[in-house]
Protein backbone atom coordinates (compact mmCIF):
# COMPACT_ATOMS: atom_id res chain seq x y z
CA UNK A 1 0.00 0.00 0.00
CA UNK A 2 2.77 2.44 0.91
CA UNK A 3 4.56 1.71 -2.38
CA UNK A 4 1.54 2.91 -4.38
CA UNK A 5 1.69 6.36 -2.79
CA UNK A 6 5.45 6.55 -2.15
CA UNK A 7 6.81 10.14 -2.03
CA UNK A 8 3.40 11.69 -2.66
CA UNK A 9 4.35 14.37 -0.15
CA UNK A 10 7.29 15.42 -2.33
CA UNK A 11 4.98 15.78 -5.32
CA UNK A 12 2.47 17.67 -3.18
CA UNK A 13 5.09 20.26 -2.19
CA UNK A 14 6.23 20.61 -5.80
CA UNK A 15 2.65 21.08 -7.01
CA UNK A 16 1.99 23.80 -4.43
CA UNK A 17 5.18 25.58 -5.54
CA UNK A 18 4.11 25.25 -9.17
CA UNK A 19 0.54 26.48 -8.63
CA UNK A 20 1.06 29.14 -5.95
CA UNK A 21 -0.04 32.00 -8.20
CA UNK A 22 -3.10 30.07 -9.31
CA UNK A 23 -3.91 29.21 -5.70
CA UNK A 24 -3.76 32.87 -4.64
CA UNK A 25 -6.07 33.97 -7.46
CA UNK A 26 -8.41 31.03 -6.80
CA UNK A 27 -8.72 31.57 -3.05
CA UNK A 28 -8.85 35.37 -3.11
CA UNK A 29 -11.11 35.59 -6.15
CA UNK A 30 -13.74 33.07 -5.08
CA UNK A 31 -13.33 34.02 -1.41
CA UNK A 32 -14.05 37.70 -2.04
CA UNK A 33 -16.92 36.85 -4.36
CA UNK A 34 -18.46 34.57 -1.73
CA UNK A 35 -18.01 36.65 1.41
CA UNK A 36 -17.42 40.30 0.52
CA UNK A 37 -20.93 41.29 -0.61
CA UNK A 38 -22.30 41.65 2.92
CA UNK A 39 -22.30 45.50 2.76
CA UNK A 40 -24.26 45.36 -0.51
CA UNK A 41 -26.86 43.12 1.10
CA UNK A 42 -27.08 45.50 4.05
CA UNK A 43 -28.18 48.21 1.62
CA UNK A 44 -30.80 45.90 0.15
CA UNK A 45 -32.11 45.03 3.63
CA UNK A 46 -32.78 48.65 4.65
CA UNK A 47 -36.39 49.68 5.27
CA UNK A 48 -38.80 47.01 4.05
CA UNK A 49 -36.14 45.44 1.86
CA UNK A 50 -35.91 42.21 3.85
CA UNK A 51 -39.66 41.65 3.80
CA UNK A 52 -39.80 42.35 0.08
CA UNK A 53 -36.93 39.96 -0.61
CA UNK A 54 -38.56 37.28 1.53
CA UNK A 55 -41.77 37.48 -0.51
CA UNK A 56 -39.78 37.43 -3.74
CA UNK A 57 -37.69 34.43 -2.69
CA UNK A 58 -40.83 32.41 -1.89
CA UNK A 59 -41.49 32.28 -5.62
CA UNK A 60 -40.94 28.67 -6.83
CA UNK A 61 -38.95 30.07 -9.75
CA UNK A 62 -36.47 31.74 -7.38
CA UNK A 63 -36.30 28.65 -5.17
CA UNK A 64 -35.40 26.56 -8.21
CA UNK A 65 -32.55 28.95 -8.99
CA UNK A 66 -31.00 29.66 -5.58
CA UNK A 67 -32.53 27.16 -3.16
CA UNK A 68 -34.98 27.37 -0.23
CA UNK A 69 -34.87 28.96 3.21
CA UNK A 70 -36.18 27.43 6.46
CA UNK A 71 -37.75 30.78 7.40
CA UNK A 72 -41.55 30.70 7.21
CA UNK A 73 -42.41 34.25 8.36
CA UNK A 74 -41.13 37.43 6.76
CA UNK A 75 -40.39 39.08 10.11
CA UNK A 76 -37.89 36.29 10.92
CA UNK A 77 -35.99 36.77 7.64
CA UNK A 78 -32.61 38.22 8.62
CA UNK A 79 -29.70 39.59 6.63
CA UNK A 80 -27.77 36.38 7.24
CA UNK A 81 -30.66 34.22 6.05
CA UNK A 82 -31.01 36.31 2.87
CA UNK A 83 -27.27 36.20 2.17
CA UNK A 84 -27.10 32.43 2.63
CA UNK A 85 -30.13 31.76 0.44
CA UNK A 86 -29.00 33.96 -2.45
CA UNK A 87 -25.24 33.31 -2.42
CA UNK A 88 -24.46 29.86 -1.01
CA UNK A 89 -25.63 27.62 -3.85
CA UNK A 90 -24.00 29.57 -6.67
CA UNK A 91 -20.73 30.03 -4.77
CA UNK A 92 -20.67 26.30 -4.05
CA UNK A 93 -21.39 25.60 -7.71
CA UNK A 94 -18.44 27.75 -8.77
CA UNK A 95 -16.21 25.97 -6.25
CA UNK A 96 -17.22 22.57 -7.64
CA UNK A 97 -16.47 23.59 -11.23
CA UNK A 98 -13.10 25.18 -10.48
CA UNK A 99 -11.97 22.19 -8.40
CA UNK A 100 -13.11 19.75 -11.08
CA UNK A 101 -11.18 21.57 -13.81
CA UNK A 102 -8.08 21.70 -11.60
CA UNK A 103 -8.12 17.97 -10.87
CA UNK A 104 -8.69 16.93 -14.49
CA UNK A 105 -5.92 19.22 -15.76
CA UNK A 106 -3.39 17.74 -13.31
CA UNK A 107 -4.39 14.08 -13.70
CA UNK A 108 -5.90 12.92 -16.97
CA UNK A 109 -4.61 15.84 -19.06
CA UNK A 110 -1.03 15.45 -17.79
CA UNK A 111 -1.34 11.74 -18.48
CA UNK A 112 -2.26 12.55 -22.10
CA UNK A 113 0.70 14.90 -22.45
CA UNK A 114 3.13 12.29 -21.15
CA UNK A 115 4.00 14.20 -17.97
CA UNK A 116 2.63 11.47 -15.71
CA UNK A 117 4.83 8.88 -17.41
CA UNK A 118 7.82 11.14 -16.85
CA UNK A 119 6.99 11.56 -13.15
CA UNK A 120 6.50 7.81 -12.69
CA UNK A 121 9.95 7.16 -14.13
CA UNK A 122 11.35 8.49 -10.85
CA UNK A 123 11.11 6.80 -7.46
CA UNK A 124 7.48 7.65 -6.76
CA UNK A 125 4.43 5.48 -6.26
CA UNK A 126 2.11 4.66 -9.14
CA UNK A 127 -0.75 6.61 -7.55
CA UNK A 128 1.33 9.25 -5.80
CA UNK A 129 0.39 11.87 -8.39
CA UNK A 130 -3.35 11.47 -7.83
CA UNK A 131 -2.97 11.61 -4.05
CA UNK A 132 -0.82 14.74 -4.31
CA UNK A 133 -3.36 16.46 -6.59
CA UNK A 134 -6.29 15.59 -4.32
CA UNK A 135 -4.32 16.78 -1.28
CA UNK A 136 -3.56 20.08 -3.01
CA UNK A 137 -7.22 20.52 -3.95
CA UNK A 138 -8.21 19.74 -0.36
CA UNK A 139 -5.77 22.33 1.01
CA UNK A 140 -7.01 25.01 -1.40
CA UNK A 141 -10.64 24.48 -0.46
CA UNK A 142 -9.88 24.48 3.27
CA UNK A 143 -8.07 27.82 2.88
CA UNK A 144 -11.03 29.08 0.86
CA UNK A 145 -13.52 28.09 3.56
CA UNK A 146 -11.48 29.74 6.32
CA UNK A 147 -11.08 32.94 4.30
CA UNK A 148 -14.81 33.17 3.60
CA UNK A 149 -15.74 32.58 7.24
CA UNK A 150 -13.23 35.11 8.55
CA UNK A 151 -14.17 37.69 5.92
CA UNK A 152 -17.88 37.51 6.71
CA UNK A 153 -17.22 37.85 10.44
CA UNK A 154 -15.06 40.92 9.86
CA UNK A 155 -18.07 43.02 8.82
CA UNK A 156 -19.50 42.79 12.36
CA UNK A 157 -23.11 42.23 11.29
CA UNK A 158 -25.30 41.11 14.18
CA UNK A 159 -27.14 38.35 12.31
CA UNK A 160 -23.91 36.94 10.79
CA UNK A 161 -22.33 35.09 13.71
CA UNK A 162 -19.13 33.04 13.84
CA UNK A 163 -20.81 29.63 13.63
CA UNK A 164 -22.91 30.59 10.64
CA UNK A 165 -20.00 32.30 8.87
CA UNK A 166 -17.70 29.28 9.13
CA UNK A 167 -20.57 26.93 8.25
CA UNK A 168 -21.11 29.06 5.14
CA UNK A 169 -17.41 28.83 4.29
CA UNK A 170 -17.28 25.13 5.14
CA UNK A 171 -20.23 24.41 2.84
CA UNK A 172 -18.44 26.05 -0.08
CA UNK A 173 -15.21 24.22 0.78
CA UNK A 174 -16.98 20.83 0.84
CA UNK A 175 -18.68 21.69 -2.44
CA UNK A 176 -15.27 22.21 -4.01
CA UNK A 177 -14.01 18.94 -2.56
CA UNK A 178 -17.01 17.06 -3.98
CA UNK A 179 -16.36 18.57 -7.41
CA UNK A 180 -12.70 17.56 -7.27
CA UNK A 181 -13.48 14.00 -6.19
CA UNK A 182 -16.08 13.57 -8.95
CA UNK A 183 -13.49 14.79 -11.45
CA UNK A 184 -10.93 12.28 -10.17
CA UNK A 185 -13.40 9.42 -10.66
CA UNK A 186 -14.31 10.59 -14.16
CA UNK A 187 -10.62 10.94 -15.01
CA UNK A 188 -10.27 7.19 -14.47
CA UNK A 189 -13.42 6.23 -16.38
CA UNK A 190 -12.94 8.43 -19.45
CA UNK A 191 -10.15 7.88 -21.96
CA UNK A 192 -9.40 11.57 -22.59
CA UNK A 193 -9.21 14.79 -20.59
CA UNK A 194 -11.93 16.28 -22.79
CA UNK A 195 -14.23 13.39 -21.95
CA UNK A 196 -13.40 13.63 -18.25
CA UNK A 197 -14.07 17.38 -18.18
CA UNK A 198 -17.29 17.11 -20.16
CA UNK A 199 -18.69 14.23 -18.12
CA UNK A 200 -17.84 15.91 -14.81
CA UNK A 201 -19.43 19.21 -15.78
CA UNK A 202 -22.44 17.35 -17.17
CA UNK A 203 -22.82 15.48 -13.89
CA UNK A 204 -22.60 18.74 -11.92
CA UNK A 205 -25.20 20.29 -14.22
CA UNK A 206 -27.47 17.27 -13.80
CA UNK A 207 -27.23 17.51 -10.01
CA UNK A 208 -28.16 21.20 -10.21
CA UNK A 209 -31.18 20.55 -12.45
CA UNK A 210 -32.41 17.66 -10.29
CA UNK A 211 -32.19 19.76 -7.12
CA UNK A 212 -34.11 22.56 -8.83
CA UNK A 213 -37.02 20.17 -9.25
CA UNK A 214 -36.88 18.56 -5.82
CA UNK A 215 -36.52 21.91 -4.02
CA UNK A 216 -39.88 22.96 -5.44
CA UNK A 217 -41.75 19.64 -5.39
CA UNK A 218 -40.33 17.74 -2.39
CA UNK A 219 -37.50 19.33 -0.40
CA UNK A 220 -36.79 16.11 1.51
CA UNK A 221 -35.51 14.51 -1.70
CA UNK A 222 -32.86 17.23 -2.05
CA UNK A 223 -31.06 15.74 0.95
CA UNK A 224 -30.19 12.73 -1.25
CA UNK A 225 -28.49 15.03 -3.77
CA UNK A 226 -24.80 15.84 -3.16
CA UNK A 227 -25.43 19.39 -4.35
CA UNK A 228 -28.23 19.72 -1.81
CA UNK A 229 -25.70 19.27 0.98
CA UNK A 230 -24.23 22.66 0.06
CA UNK A 231 -27.21 24.85 0.97
CA UNK A 232 -29.30 22.62 3.25
CA UNK A 233 -26.85 23.51 6.02
CA UNK A 234 -28.91 26.73 6.38
CA UNK A 235 -26.18 29.02 7.79
CA UNK A 236 -27.32 31.82 10.14
CA UNK A 237 -30.70 30.11 10.71
CA UNK A 238 -30.62 26.40 11.60
CA UNK A 239 -26.82 26.00 11.34
CA UNK A 240 -27.22 22.35 10.35
CA UNK A 241 -23.79 20.67 10.18
CA UNK A 242 -25.18 17.22 9.30
CA UNK A 243 -25.11 17.71 5.48
CA UNK A 244 -21.38 18.45 5.70
CA UNK A 245 -20.89 15.07 7.36
CA UNK A 246 -22.73 13.44 4.44
CA UNK A 247 -20.52 15.40 2.02
CA UNK A 248 -17.37 14.28 3.83
CA UNK A 249 -18.40 10.60 3.77
CA UNK A 250 -19.35 10.90 0.09
CA UNK A 251 -15.96 12.43 -0.73
CA UNK A 252 -14.06 9.71 1.12
CA UNK A 253 -15.99 6.91 -0.58
CA UNK A 254 -15.51 8.35 -4.06
CA UNK A 255 -11.83 9.05 -3.41
CA UNK A 256 -11.30 5.39 -2.52
CA UNK A 257 -13.31 4.41 -5.62
CA UNK A 258 -11.10 6.60 -7.81
CA UNK A 259 -7.91 5.02 -6.45
CA UNK A 260 -9.33 1.51 -6.98
CA UNK A 261 -10.25 2.36 -10.57
CA UNK A 262 -6.82 3.86 -11.22
CA UNK A 263 -5.08 0.81 -9.79
CA UNK A 264 -6.81 -1.54 -12.22
CA UNK A 265 -6.30 0.39 -15.47
CA UNK A 266 -3.32 0.94 -17.72
CA UNK A 267 -1.79 4.38 -18.03
CA UNK A 268 -3.42 6.30 -20.87
CA UNK A 269 -6.43 3.97 -20.95
CA UNK A 270 -9.95 4.42 -19.63
CA UNK A 271 -12.88 2.22 -18.71
CA UNK A 272 -14.95 3.82 -21.47
CA UNK A 273 -12.65 3.79 -24.51
CA UNK A 274 -13.16 6.15 -27.41
CA UNK A 275 -15.51 5.01 -30.17
CA UNK A 276 -13.81 3.58 -33.22
CA UNK A 277 -13.93 5.81 -36.27
CA UNK A 278 -15.06 5.04 -39.80
CA UNK A 279 -12.92 2.88 -42.07
CA UNK A 280 -12.95 5.65 -44.68
CA UNK A 281 -13.26 9.38 -44.04
CA UNK A 282 -16.13 11.48 -45.37
CA UNK A 283 -15.49 13.91 -48.21
CA UNK A 284 -16.57 16.76 -45.92
CA UNK A 285 -13.25 16.39 -44.08
CA UNK A 286 -11.47 17.69 -47.19
CA UNK A 287 -12.73 21.20 -46.38
CA UNK A 288 -11.70 23.35 -43.42
CA UNK A 289 -15.31 23.92 -42.22
CA UNK A 290 -16.05 20.19 -42.46
CA UNK A 291 -12.89 19.29 -40.56
CA UNK A 292 -13.53 21.76 -37.75
CA UNK A 293 -17.17 20.76 -37.47
CA UNK A 294 -16.05 17.14 -37.10
CA UNK A 295 -13.53 18.09 -34.41
CA UNK A 296 -16.16 20.00 -32.40
CA UNK A 297 -19.19 17.82 -33.17
CA UNK A 298 -19.16 15.84 -29.93
CA UNK A 299 -18.77 18.90 -27.71
CA UNK A 300 -21.45 20.82 -29.60
CA UNK A 301 -24.01 18.01 -29.51
CA UNK A 302 -23.43 17.41 -25.80
CA UNK A 303 -23.84 21.08 -24.87
CA UNK A 304 -26.86 21.60 -27.15
CA UNK A 305 -28.66 18.68 -25.51
CA UNK A 306 -27.77 20.14 -22.11
CA UNK A 307 -29.27 23.51 -23.11
CA UNK A 308 -32.57 21.87 -24.11
CA UNK A 309 -32.72 19.92 -20.84
CA UNK A 310 -31.86 23.04 -18.83
CA UNK A 311 -34.58 25.06 -20.55
CA UNK A 312 -37.13 22.29 -20.04
CA UNK A 313 -36.22 21.99 -16.35
CA UNK A 314 -36.87 25.68 -15.72
CA UNK A 315 -39.96 25.67 -17.93
CA UNK A 316 -41.61 23.03 -15.76
CA UNK A 317 -41.73 25.53 -12.88
CA UNK A 318 -44.08 27.98 -14.61
CA UNK A 319 -47.17 26.09 -13.44
CA UNK A 320 -46.01 26.35 -9.81
CA UNK A 321 -45.47 30.10 -10.26
CA UNK A 322 -49.11 30.63 -11.18
CA UNK A 323 -50.22 28.67 -8.11
CA UNK A 324 -47.86 30.76 -5.96
CA UNK A 325 -49.15 34.03 -7.41
CA UNK A 326 -52.76 32.99 -6.89
CA UNK A 327 -52.15 32.45 -3.17
CA UNK A 328 -50.00 35.55 -2.52
CA UNK A 329 -51.99 38.78 -2.58
CA UNK A 330 -48.95 41.03 -2.10
CA UNK A 331 -47.09 39.61 -5.10
CA UNK A 332 -50.27 39.69 -7.19
CA UNK A 333 -50.72 43.41 -6.50
CA UNK A 334 -47.06 44.10 -7.26
CA UNK A 335 -47.18 42.47 -10.68
CA UNK A 336 -50.59 44.00 -11.46
CA UNK A 337 -49.29 47.50 -10.77
CA UNK A 338 -46.08 46.96 -12.76
CA UNK A 339 -48.01 45.80 -15.83
CA UNK A 340 -45.68 42.82 -16.28
CA UNK A 341 -46.75 39.24 -15.61
CA UNK A 342 -44.76 37.00 -13.29
CA UNK A 343 -44.03 34.71 -16.25
CA UNK A 344 -42.53 37.56 -18.27
CA UNK A 345 -40.47 38.76 -15.31
CA UNK A 346 -39.06 35.30 -14.63
CA UNK A 347 -38.40 34.69 -18.33
CA UNK A 348 -36.26 37.82 -18.53
CA UNK A 349 -34.28 36.73 -15.46
CA UNK A 350 -33.76 33.10 -16.38
CA UNK A 351 -32.82 34.03 -19.95
CA UNK A 352 -29.85 36.00 -18.65
CA UNK A 353 -28.72 32.95 -16.69
CA UNK A 354 -29.17 30.55 -19.61
CA UNK A 355 -27.48 32.85 -22.13
CA UNK A 356 -24.54 33.14 -19.74
CA UNK A 357 -24.30 29.34 -19.76
CA UNK A 358 -24.73 29.17 -23.54
CA UNK A 359 -21.62 31.34 -23.95
CA UNK A 360 -19.58 28.41 -22.63
CA UNK A 361 -20.07 26.56 -25.93
CA UNK A 362 -18.56 29.23 -28.25
CA UNK A 363 -15.66 29.63 -25.83
CA UNK A 364 -15.09 25.86 -25.89
CA UNK A 365 -15.12 25.85 -29.70
CA UNK A 366 -12.55 28.64 -29.93
CA UNK A 367 -10.42 27.03 -27.24
CA UNK A 368 -10.43 23.80 -29.26
CA UNK A 369 -8.46 25.54 -32.01
CA UNK A 370 -5.80 26.57 -29.50
CA UNK A 371 -5.68 23.05 -28.03
CA UNK A 372 -5.32 21.39 -31.44
CA UNK A 373 -2.54 23.78 -32.43
CA UNK A 374 -0.70 23.30 -29.12
CA UNK A 375 -0.75 19.53 -29.62
CA UNK A 376 0.68 20.01 -33.15
CA UNK A 377 -2.37 18.35 -34.73
CA UNK A 378 -2.61 21.17 -37.30
CA UNK A 379 1.02 21.08 -38.42
CA UNK A 380 0.23 19.14 -41.59
CA UNK A 381 -2.38 21.72 -42.58
CA UNK A 382 0.09 24.58 -42.27
CA UNK A 383 2.34 23.15 -45.01
CA UNK A 384 -0.56 23.39 -47.50
CA UNK A 385 -2.22 26.47 -49.00
CA UNK A 386 -4.49 26.76 -45.94
CA UNK A 387 -3.64 29.86 -43.89
CA UNK A 388 -3.96 30.47 -40.18
CA UNK A 389 -6.55 33.12 -41.01
CA UNK A 390 -8.79 30.50 -42.62
CA UNK A 391 -8.59 28.32 -39.54
CA UNK A 392 -9.23 31.27 -37.23
CA UNK A 393 -12.26 32.69 -39.07
CA UNK A 394 -13.74 29.24 -39.64
CA UNK A 395 -13.57 28.65 -35.90
CA UNK A 396 -15.10 32.06 -35.14
CA UNK A 397 -18.04 31.48 -37.50
CA UNK A 398 -18.55 27.98 -36.08
CA UNK A 399 -18.54 29.41 -32.54
CA UNK A 400 -21.11 32.07 -33.50
CA UNK A 401 -23.29 29.43 -35.17
CA UNK A 402 -23.10 27.20 -32.08
CA UNK A 403 -24.04 30.12 -29.82
CA UNK A 404 -27.04 31.12 -31.96
CA UNK A 405 -28.33 27.55 -32.13
CA UNK A 406 -27.72 27.10 -28.40
CA UNK A 407 -29.82 30.15 -27.51
CA UNK A 408 -32.59 28.96 -29.82
CA UNK A 409 -32.70 25.46 -28.34
CA UNK A 410 -32.57 26.73 -24.75
CA UNK A 411 -35.38 29.21 -25.47
CA UNK A 412 -37.46 26.57 -27.24
CA UNK A 413 -36.96 24.09 -24.41
CA UNK A 414 -37.96 26.71 -21.86
CA UNK A 415 -40.96 27.95 -23.85
CA UNK A 416 -42.32 24.58 -24.89
CA UNK A 417 -42.24 23.16 -21.37
CA UNK A 418 -43.53 26.40 -19.80
CA UNK A 419 -46.54 26.59 -22.13
CA UNK A 420 -47.31 22.95 -21.40
CA UNK A 421 -47.03 23.53 -17.63
CA UNK A 422 -49.29 26.61 -17.70
CA UNK A 423 -51.86 24.82 -19.91
CA UNK A 424 -54.57 27.25 -21.06
CA UNK A 425 -53.57 30.02 -18.64
CA UNK A 426 -50.43 31.01 -20.50
CA UNK A 427 -50.01 34.69 -21.41
CA UNK A 428 -46.99 33.92 -23.61
CA UNK A 429 -46.40 31.86 -26.73
CA UNK A 430 -43.27 30.23 -28.12
CA UNK A 431 -42.30 33.29 -30.16
CA UNK A 432 -42.21 35.36 -26.96
CA UNK A 433 -39.65 33.00 -25.46
CA UNK A 434 -37.56 33.00 -28.64
CA UNK A 435 -37.71 36.80 -28.74
CA UNK A 436 -36.56 36.95 -25.11
CA UNK A 437 -33.62 34.71 -25.95
CA UNK A 438 -32.44 36.69 -28.96
CA UNK A 439 -33.34 40.15 -27.65
Please place each PLM-identified region on the residue numbering.
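Juxtamembrane inter-helical linkers in multi-pass membrane proteins
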Residues: 117, 122, 268-288, 329-333, ...
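Alpha-helical transmembrane segments of multi-pass membrane transporters/translocases
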Residues: 22, 26-30, 232-288, 295-311
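Long, hydrophobic alpha-helical segments
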Residues: 83-108, 345-369
Amino acid sequence: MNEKFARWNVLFIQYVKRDWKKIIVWVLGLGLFSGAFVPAFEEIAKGQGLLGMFETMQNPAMISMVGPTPIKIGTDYTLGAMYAQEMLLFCGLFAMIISALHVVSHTRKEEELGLTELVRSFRVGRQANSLAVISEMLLINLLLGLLIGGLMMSFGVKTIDAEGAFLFGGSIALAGIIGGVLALVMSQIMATSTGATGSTLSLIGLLYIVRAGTDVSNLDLSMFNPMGWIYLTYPFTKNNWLPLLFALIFSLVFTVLAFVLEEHRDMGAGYLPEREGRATAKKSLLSVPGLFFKINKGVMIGWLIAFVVMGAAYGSIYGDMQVFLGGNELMKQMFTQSGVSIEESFTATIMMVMIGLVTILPIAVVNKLFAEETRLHLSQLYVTKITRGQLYWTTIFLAIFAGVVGIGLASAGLGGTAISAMKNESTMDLTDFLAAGYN
